[in-house]
Amino acid sequence: MRVNIEEKSYDGKRKILKNIKLDIPKHQTTLIIGTSGAGKSTLIKCLIRQTKFKGTIIDEGYDHKAMLEKIAYISQHPTLNKNETVEESIYWTARLNFLRQSKANLLEKTKKCINDAGLNYVCKQPVKALSGGQMQRVAIAKELIRDKEILIADEIDTGLDCGVARSLCNMLNHIAHKEKKTVIVISHNLINIELYDNVVVLVKDSNKTGRIAYHGSPYQMKTFFQVHDYVYILMKLNSEDEGGENLADFYIDQYERSI
């Protein structure tokens, strides 16, 4: 997916995003993190065409409008029928999306998605009996069964403990690498950052506009930002150097010079 958002503003005045240029690799996981107010949610809205912007988003020759047919989106608070069992919830999603397929085929798809999402041990339980992490797995499975090529997950690890969030990351990696999906994740959680193939860091420049300060491997981030731990990256991008310069501006310039 090639993203080129020249500018996103509201009322033609306040710029929210500027110069967002990304090549998001196929069949890999890409994590998008950022400082508060840097435009992560707005970027997602651009990707799923919920807001207008100046620029283009294309994928393998498909324009943005046509590309929407290839995208599955999972929100932080997915809508689930909590009275259904896990198996029923996923099966009926398949039934609604593949009307001409036989029941046997749909049940086979359901079984595979339950397995891929790590839900075998709770498949007969009602959704309302699940934990928050398990409900997110059901939401992912319901999108996975629709067989879209691109999966976008928005803050799905919010409120989950570290172990559960890590297991979700591992599942998303399985979906990307084994099921050949392109997975994009928005998160504020830096603990599992090394599990992703690629990381994008959004920051606010001195004009309060969201820009890219980094895009690359998580293993090169510490060197790029000159920190010994990932947790210090966003703290550093919210500070100034000894001369009073906005460090976010410095790293935006460093990144844009490198591309």
Predicted regions and their residues:
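Conserved ABC ATPase "signature" region
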Residues: 105-122
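Hydrophobic anchor residue at the start of the ABC signature
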Residues: 140, 168
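Conserved ABC ATPase signature
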Residues: 126-130
